Amino acid sequence: MGQKVNPNGIRLGYIRDWRSTWYADSSRYATKLNEDIKVREFLHKKLAAAAVSKIQIERPAQNAKITIHTARSGIVIGKKGEDVEKLRAEVHKLMGIPVQINIEEVRKPEIDAKLVAESVAQQLEKRVMFRRAMKKAMQAAMKSGAKGIKIMVSGRLGGAEIARSEWARDGRVPLQTFRADVDYATAEALTTYGVIGVKVWIYKGEILPGQIAEKKNNKKRS
């Protein structure tokens, strides 16, 4: 029987990069990992209205470089960069080292799995029918250039007594192909009937090893 694995984790080191890039010896590893978890939790909570897709953390020397990928960069930056400065000071308190915060705008939130999952979850919390929410998200993703999308919702759907899972797919989503650029994310909808889980897979096309090398070189230049 086939076993399901996280589509992001299985592609790490091949077409995906780690979201935390730093080195630590065995005595400091757990402390730094715990810091990363706390920083991510703090930022996701603080920037709940900013549609944050992912947070990358780098630790060059005795500093920290945090890149926030968001669909609403204006909310994070604030007037004349005031909000981002406050954020930097708060993260500095958490980590205890100098912190640099960079903001990267998500150009197409319709094909970002995390943002799509959170959007569907928010609609479920507002009592929108799950099939309508799924259909709307899939149509928007396919219009924005996705090659395929699959959405699954699990829980007491529509207030049913027995929890169940429902899913819908448009296009193709190849989970077995390592070079397939499949974005995967989950979210939770807190409804009056209980928690409803949302899973989203978005296929954006194939990435070849040469293309990955080009991306890394471009990052180093910038």
Swiss-Prot record:
InterPro entries: KH_dom (IPR004087), KH_dom-like_a/b (IPR015946), KH_dom_type_2 (IPR004044), KH_sf_prok-type (IPR009019), Ribosomal_S3_C_sf (IPR036419), Ribosomal_uS3_bac-typ (IPR005704), Ribosomal_uS3_C (IPR001351), Ribosomal_uS3_CS (IPR018280). GO terms for biological process: translation. Residues 39-107 form the KH type-2 domain. GO terms for molecular function: mRNA binding; rRNA binding; structural constituent of ribosome. CDD domains: KH-II_30S_S3. Pfam families: KH_2 (PF07650), Ribosomal_S3_C (PF00189). It comes from the Bacteria. Part of the 30S ribosomal subunit. Forms a tight complex with proteins S10 and S14. Belongs to the universal ribosomal protein uS3 family. Binds the lower part of the 30S subunit head. Binds mRNA in the 70S ribosome, positioning it for translation. This is Small ribosomal subunit protein uS3. The gene is rpsC.
